[in-house]
């Protein structure tokens, strides 16, 4: 059953390169949209929030390498191949590569009512330096 669901999603997904000289692709599948992103060593995004009146949020799926996901005020969670993280709307977080390893992941935006993304401050070198 899981394989069939994965195949159906793959059949309906459309990939488009969204940046030059990077491994970032836009993905559109049914009502979901997202990015397949490759992150070199030491790469991480800023803190951000996926807002929505209802529904919304983000799903992260590690497809290669090793990375981290962290909710503000909590310990970072290591992500390895196959790990899937469901982030509800209105949760401040960041995600990116481990300090010593490349990381590739799918970042899927969950459909929601009146959804938007708010990009915030960078993850500090001090915060990032705590990762193993």
Feature names for model-found ranges:
Residues 1-35, 46, 116-132:
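A short, N-terminal "cap"/entry segment at the start of jelly-roll beta-barrel domains
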Residues 30-31, 54, 74, 100-101, ...:
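Short strand-connecting beta-turns/loops that link adjacent beta-strands
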Residues 36-54, 89:
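Conserved short histidine dyad/triad with adjacent acidic residue
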Residues 38, 63-64, 80:
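A cytosolic small-molecule/anion-sensing beta-strand core signal
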Residues 55-67, 72-73:
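Glycine- and acidic-residue-biased ligand/ion/polar-headgroup-sensing regions
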Residues 59, 73-90:
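Short acidic-glycine-tyrosine-enriched beta hairpin
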Residues 59, 86, 100-119:
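A short hydrophobic beta-strand segment most commonly corresponding to one strand
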Residues 96-98:
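Asparagine-centered strand-capping/turn motif at beta-strand->loop junctions
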